[in-house]
Amino acid sequence: MADSDDEYDRKRRDKFRGERSDSYRTERRDDRRPVGGSAGARDEWAERNPFRGGASAGGGGARHRPDYSDYRGPGARPRYGSPGRDLPPAKRMRPDWGDADLRPNPRFGGYDPYLMQAWNDHYQSMHSAYSHAGHAPPVRESIGGGGDTLTQPAMLNLKQFLDTQDENISDSEVMRKYTEYKTDFKRQQLNEFFVAHKDEEWFKNKYHPEDSVKRSDEQRGFLQRRTDVFVELLENGTIGSVKVDSSQGDALIRVLDTCVIKLEGGTDEDLKVLDEKPKDPVVCERKAEPIESAKAVEKTINSPKEEKISEGDPLPAIVSPQRKTVKSVNSDEENWDDEDAENATPKKELGEDSKGTDSKPEDKQLNKKKTKKRKRNSTDDDSSSSESSSSSDEEKLKEKYDVEDGLRAEQKADAEKDRHEATKAKQEPESPKLQELEGKEIVEPKELDSKSNTAENDDTLKSPEISPTPIKGTDNGDDNKVEEDEKKPSVDEIKVVETETIDLDKVKNGQPRALHRTSSIFLRNLAPSITRAEIETVCNRFTGYLRVAIADPLVERRWYRRGWITFMRDVNIKEICWGLNNHRLRDCEMGAIVNRDLSRRVRPANGITAHKQVVRSDIKLCAKIALNLDERFRLWAEVPTDDSHPSRADESTENGSGSTYGFNSKNPVLQNITDYLIEEASAEEEELLGLTGENKDTDGEPIERDEQLISVLDRLVLYLRIVHSVDYYNHCEYPYEDEMPNRCGIIHARGPAPVRVTNNDVQEYIKTYESKLQQFLTKTVLLSDEEIKDLGAKDPETEVEKFVQANTQELAKDKWLCPLSGKKFKGPEFIRKHIFNKHEEKVDEVRKEVQYFNNYLRDPKRPQLPEHPGTSKRTESESARGGGGGYRPPMYPPFSAMPYGFGPPMMGGGRGGRNFPPARRELPLEHQRRLIGYHDLDAPANSDMFD
């Protein structure tokens, strides 16, 4: 019964096979063994030994029992296949770098070369060090060929390095050579890292002579724009009217939103949107006017062309044929069936209203088929539902388009107002144009029909590519006029577009825009090779794309990055997210998910920050940070200097002409700041009255607030937050905030103050907080030329000479070849002249490459792989185990071949082909220790003795 084919086909035993113990399997298999138990054991050893098959199966181990598919024959692929022989399923192609447990790298089989101390890899590594059945141990991948790993390769310690040297070498010579080895090892790691990442965009933006300058100019432009907005708000009293207290959260959010609207190019008219509250009457309008609500629902699903037409004219005849095309490209039919069922009744009414329009009979037939199909779905749903199905449908509709997206109701209400105003305003001025167009329609019906056919075909073909136009059209109506001239649509489309241009101008002049609200998508997985331009090309196909932000790569994520894509608020962000998930860049799943809105924008800090002594200390720290950041980016400098490297500004301020506050800076928040940094105390009075600080230390003193000091501090805190994106009370910086969905999203403010506070608590808080802000207080100083020489800096002229020599080839006597052009010359000096005259751009590329590499070395915070834990933490006993030898193989797999030809592999089994350990070398005197003899008194007489 257990061996029947039906039992195998049901695959119920597959998922429990790995959970049964060895004893259970042994008992079940005893009756099937031959009489000669040894022969059966040998036959089944390959299936029962967990260490067999590790090398052939990629380190994953073989099955403990025969596969059911072997008995079953060809059929469906088993669900629980071997990881070494079967490809992983499609949804498991995401890399494992995001996991915190540091799972082994699949490149290296079942173990990772730099995580060999892990318990899961111990048995595999110990097994793979031995050879089985004449097969050599598996060869490890070289460090430079297979890409980056989590750490650098392990460096030899002194004892391992001694085994590579001659036995007669002196101690001083050993130490000198070992120092050279460590220096060369570091140089090689820096060079390998540079070669591996020099073609990636994030690396070029940091160190490339041209790209880094462009990036720094772009960031300086962002900072200058933020500075202008802050000064404007400071002058009109917006900054001075708010305090950075958690109790004034609404006022702080209003200030941040005002900054965002100004940064987006908004006007004072757009700031009125901050006074408007979310509209509740939208639900009532939806119940009273089902047609309008259906249009609002369709607006979020339709293509950009439909969106543009529905805003100008409520005629649905032009909308219906395009909706099918866009859904087939950007959406999935299975995911939108529910919405079709919900919208069946309103769309039927729309179809009846559109009978009087100029739509084609083919389009009408398509609409009828759609409505019949939706009717069928809706009747099936109604037959199985209760009497309250209509109300539940409305609740689903509200939850999907109002509750989930939160603020979309406000945008819809604004669109309804705009539509009503547009219909009132367009009637009188549009009448002569409409008459002329109608006359043209009567005179030339054939030409218009042909143009309408071509326009519809163009729309169906180009529907995913014209998506950005409606959103940008809300800011400028001229873009829509250009579309009219290019596409030449039919009469009805011309009416719609013309009325839309007029309406958009009125909306721009009279209706405030909520520029501070956006929708965004988070990309969890971006390969280092993916560029910003590639992401922008993909996103430009969707409606309302604004910008993209890409984070810096992290070593623990295997240099993969994260990204945020920002769209306008009124787009269907879920449909866009679905389209991005169906798109792959460079064979990489981006992992797009919808980014939620910020939950708490104002977050409380420690209430002790309101104490007068702490406030004065915070003013001092804020002034230092502001001065340091202003000098780094030269925001308030009189004459900006041109530098070849973006970080060169740090060197110009190293000797610092602005070390005092307010004197050498034109920053308005730093003017007269020294008046508030001088501490005052009634020390004489306390001494005469016998008042000491003992009572304050034991019982504490109440929180003392100085409103004047607090107002000065608030200006500094808001300046750092708005201009430099530094959240002072969270002691952190929000990087690349100008490209993020929320340009001024979160701020930390002073929380509720405690009743009493002791002097020790105040001093401890001040000391701790200053240590947390050291990253902003210290100036970044680039390494000097002498320091980067030790790291392997290159000379431009030397590298150019190497380039010339590499492109000078001698073919025969007095016959030389230049590989760059293929021309032949009589001597090398002619090739040299030829290269400098005809290939000057390639010589310049060599010089730029040298400067590129030196810029990387000059950065003290340069990215690089972390050191191997064995380099610094491995004890001598662990190192000695890997010394090699023929008697016992090493406990761990061998590393890659050692750089610079230093004799044997790092932890290999002896030198070359020898099968015995190398001669033991003596350590220098400072590393030697006295050997202690040992003799076992209970051992027999012929045993070994160690004296």
Swiss-Prot record:
Keyword Nucleus: yes
Bias (Basic residues) ranges: 367-376
Biased composition (Basic and acidic residues): 8-34, 41-50, 295-311, 345-366, 393-450, 478-493, 642-651
UniProt entry keywords in alphabetical sequence: Nucleus, Phosphoprotein, RNA-mediated gene silencing
Residues with PTM Phosphoserine: 82, 303, 331, 354, 431, 644, 647
UniProt modified residues of type Phosphothreonine: 300
Compositionally biased residues, Polar residues: 654-664
Protein name in the entry: Serrate RNA effector molecule homolog
Name of the encoding gene: Ars2
